[in-house]
Amino acid sequence: MIIVLKNNSQEKQVEELLNWHDQFHVSTNLVEGVHSNVIGLIGDTTQIDIEAVQAKECVENVQRVQEPYKNANRKFHPDNTVIDVAGRKIGGGKLQVIAGPCSVETEEQIITTAIAVKEAGATMLRGGAFKPRTSPYSFQGLGKEGIDLLIQARKITGLPIVTEIMDLSDLDCFADVDVVQVGARNMQNFTLLKALGRSDKPVLLKRGLSSTLQELLMSAEYIMSEGNQNVILCERGIRTFEPATRNTLDLSAVPLLQQKTHLPITVDPSHATGIASLVEPMALCAVTAGCDALEIEVHNDPKNAWSDGAQSLTPAQFAETMKKVKALSEFMGKPLDVNE
């Protein structure tokens, strides 16, 4: 249930309204927006008389929410959520670009790539330390050593770091990471999601291979219901009948999610296509669709990459792509954030 408050509501009136709802054993969440203040009620609201609530002096109107996700629902939180990542604002009206290799391999590789993507205009650095691979014989990542190398690259470039967590037992390794990424395979690892919800560290949540948008939002709800509101959604392609690309990028998800939720939205054209030559056109399409951030894989030597070289751009290719992203983002009214 959502209660929209009148603009002239007094603080005491709002406090009395919140206290009045305690008798129904529901949780209340007061959201102070730009245009209006809203109280979201989460729990069993069937016993609450809407007319009785509507009669309160400070209440503008009351709405029942049919969707199962509440915290992530735009009706609960009309204004866009802006997530601060070490000074970078995701969802704040400027486009962020997260770039870097699929896997952290060596000190030279990650630092060389980090410097290159920053020079091209990337605002955050990505790199996998713990890698979920289809084959048990494929490179699984450097683990904690990989995170240490990312931190070293951050010291040199100043770029906030984004890396994926696979298992709850590794959570302590991510204490100094700026954004924890939850991959497609773990989107419904609810134990992991709840644990991440008990921190305030930003979480980049990727859509599962065969997941609906509602399932994605319900996974976000798991994190948010534990208290962490810093959730970034990511469209990275879904599995369809088409074998020509690694996945099928669902660009319609971007504007549709923006209607349904206040959370910022990232698009990953690298995993969506699996083909380096398709990354640039799909990145530009994602900017046109209105995404808040792009996540692009870049490797200093893709032909010899330890994982996903086929979808990785060279630094030179990435620099050319960024020129087009910059021009298009300005035209679309969400300009690329400037690297200091």
Predicted regions and their residues:
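Catalytic beta/alpha-barrel core
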Residues: K6, L142, G158-S169, D178-T191, ...
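Active-site mouth loops of central-metabolism enzymes
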Residues: N8, L95-T112, P136-Q140, P160-E164, ...
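N-terminal amphipathic alpha-helix/helix-capping segment at the start of soluble metabolic enzymes
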Residues: E67-I98, K323, E330-E340
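N-terminal small/glycine-rich loop or linker at the start of catalytic domains
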Residues: N80-C102, K131-P136, Q258-V267
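Catalytic alpha/beta core domains of metabolic enzymes, predominantly
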Residues: V85, S199-V298
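Hydrophobic faces of well-ordered beta-strands that scaffold small-molecule active sites
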Residues: Q96-P101, T123-G127, I161-T163, V180-V182, ...
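Glycine-rich, proline-tolerant flexible connector loops at the mouths of alpha/beta enzymes
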Residues: R126-K144, N300-S312
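Alpha-helix-loop-beta-strand connector modules within alpha/beta enzyme cores
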Residues: F139-T163, A195-P202, L251-T266, Q311-K334
